[in-house]
Amino acid sequence: MKIAIIQYSTYGHITQLAKAVQKGVADAGYKADIFQVPETLPQEVLDKMHAPAKPTDIPIATNDTLTEYDAFLFGVPTRYGTAPAQFFEFWGATGGLWANGSLAGKPAGVFVSTSGQGGGQETTVRNFLNFLAHHGMPYIPLGYANAFALQSSMEEVHGGSPYGAGTFANVDGSRQPSTLELEIAEKQGEAFVKSATKLVKGSKKTNTTTTSKSAATSDAAGTTSGTAAGTSAATGAATGTSAPKESTKEASSSAKKEATNGTATRTQQSTKAPETAEKSSCSKCIIM
């Protein structure tokens, strides 16, 4: 199972959580690769925000990333209780994948970063589920079973919820993820693997079984057809019957006419109706 951690981070808080989640995945016996979604803000704006340069050792996520990997963990900083524009742009470019159902059945989890309590630790994840739902991607929450003691700790103010790991960054980004928050993120990585492997292995097993059944059915049909043809030929040879030449000519002529008509009909049916150019991936959602 190939796991990708796809995240966006302005000041590095989400990236720190991503690395903790990656460690949790490794502790569960799997490997996860970290990616970052493309930046949409101009450098001039980023400079005014005093945002550090993006890590050069973390590759950019593309549609190919989504098709090549089997399961995903998304690191999402909040913007007014939902994902930032960078993630909306990222998902907005996946219309082709949506049309083909390329991501259907691929499990996903989410972890977040907000400025403080009430800043969207839960709503950011819930709003992010819109993307997963439209693509048919099963959502795997952190829950409580794997990290209850950590999540319910009252020793310090901390991020995270049953929806996923989280951190508080403060309004100016000065607060860094605490040891407790990083431990919860690790637990999410471990818990995600336990559930995702069941879904991915089950999906692959189903696909393999379906393919095998189709092949077996095809082989059986071919064998039956061949046997029937052989029996028919043997029967004809044994009785020594043959059709009159005139009847053969008439049958041949009739077959040619039917073939010609059939070809014309298929040609007519296969002619494509005029198509309206799709302006954006969202137009499909509006129409449907």
UniProtKB/Swiss-Prot annotation:
Protein name: NAD(P)H quinone oxidoreductase YCP4
Organism: Candida albicans (strain SC5314 / ATCC MYA-2876) (Yeast)
GO process terms (BP): cellular response to oxidative stress; positive regulation of ferroptosis
Induction of the gene: Expression is down-regulated during biofilm formation.
Main location: membrane
Residue pairs linked by disulfide bridges in the UniProt entry: none
Composition bias type Polar residues, residue spans: 261-288
Cofactor or coenzyme needed: FMN
Topology of the protein relative to the lipid bilayer: Peripheral membrane protein
UniProt KW Flavoprotein keyword: yes
Stated role: Flavodoxin-like protein (FLP) that plays a role in cell wall integrity, oxidative stress protection and virulence. FLPs act as NAD(P)H quinone oxidoreductases. Reduces ubiquinone (coenzyme Q), enabling it to serve as an antioxidant in the membrane.
Phenotype of the disrupted gene, per the record: Increases the sensitivity to the oxidative stress agent H(2)O(2). Quadruple mutant lacking all four FLPs (PST1, PST2, PST3 and YCP4) is more sensitive to benzoquinone and linolenic acid, a polyunsaturated fatty acid that can auto-oxidize and promote lipid peroxidation. The quadruple mutant is also avirulent in a mouse model of systemic candidiasis.
Chemical reaction(s) catalysed: a quinone + NADH + H(+) = a quinol + NAD(+); a quinone + NADPH + H(+) = a quinol + NADP(+)
Example GO molecular function: NAD(P)H dehydrogenase (quinone) activity
Record's compositionally biased regions (Low complexity): 205-254
SUPFAM superfamilies listed in its UniProt record: Flavoproteins
Subcellular location(s) of the protein: Cell membrane
KW Membrane (keyword) present: yes
EC numbers: 1.6.5.2
Recorded family membership: Belongs to the WrbA family.
Keywords: Cell membrane, Flavoprotein, FMN, Membrane, NAD, Nucleotide-binding, Oxidoreductase, Virulence
Region of interest (Disordered), ranges: 202-288
GO cellular component, one term: cytoplasm
Superkingdom classification of source: Eukaryota
